[in-house]
Amino acid sequence: MVTNRSHLSHHLPVIVLCISIFILLLIVIILSLLPPIATDALVHHLAIPKLWLLNGGFYEIKWSVFSYYPMNVDLLYLIPLYFHNDIIPNFIHMGFGIGTSWLIFRYLSNKLNRVAGLLGVLVFFSTPIVLRMSTVAYVDLGLVFFTTASILAYLHWRNEEYKKNKWLVLSAIAMGLALGTKYNALIAWLFLTLAIIFFYSRDTEKQWPAIKYGAIFFLVSL
């Protein structure tokens, strides 16, 4: 009996966190089943791909400034819209939020423990703006996912003492996808490029290689 109680108390934080995350996810799924009513979804993220489908291909929509914005995530909405489904885009956008949660969980679990990983997921997913964004066909969670992936890939490269350059390339590719999702990624792109140069130079005391790797990240991201 004592052993069972000890076992339960040991796993209680994990159980509570998992239940909390499940409840939040269930609420988001239910809300995502509603038809799109968000303004940006109706005039931009779903409207532009729908116009492309009606035209039979890409074309310049001069009357809509939104058509000149980055469209990486919006292009994914073409598939369900082709089948006249405007609900699936909500779940596609939600998927980026879940993907970001997974990245947070993996990072914190490896750095600390599973409880910290689940707590990180709960804090992220319970943030009001994340909950709201998870129920609409926007692109912001795609931006968050790609930016987070880029930063974590860079940290992995740095933790490996800059020996596995594939992580730098993966970081640059992820940042490039973020840039193709929303212009806000330009800020993260600039700061991460400078961070690569600064920390590599400080950690290795080599300036020219630092500039070289910063340039590689900068150019591959484009």
Give residue spans per PLM region:
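Membrane-interface transmembrane helices that cradle and orient dolichyl/undecaprenyl
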Residues: 150-167, 202
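Transmembrane-helix signature of polytopic, membrane-embedded enzymes
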Residues: 87-88, 102-126, 145, 162-163
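Transmembrane alpha-helices of multi-pass, membrane-embedded glycan-processing enzymes
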Residues: 73, 77-84, 89-103, 143-146
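Start-transfer (signal-anchor) and selected internal transmembrane alpha helices
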Residues: 1-28, 212-218
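Membrane-interface alpha helices of multi-pass inner-membrane proteins
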Residues: 120-121, 154, 167-183
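Short acidic/glycine- and proline-prone juxtamembrane loop motifs at membrane-interface regions
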Residues: 132-142
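Extracytoplasmic catalytic/substrate-binding loops of multi-pass membrane glycan-assembly enzymes
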Residues: 34-48, 54-76, 83-88
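Perimembrane helix-loop-helix junctions
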Residues: 188-221
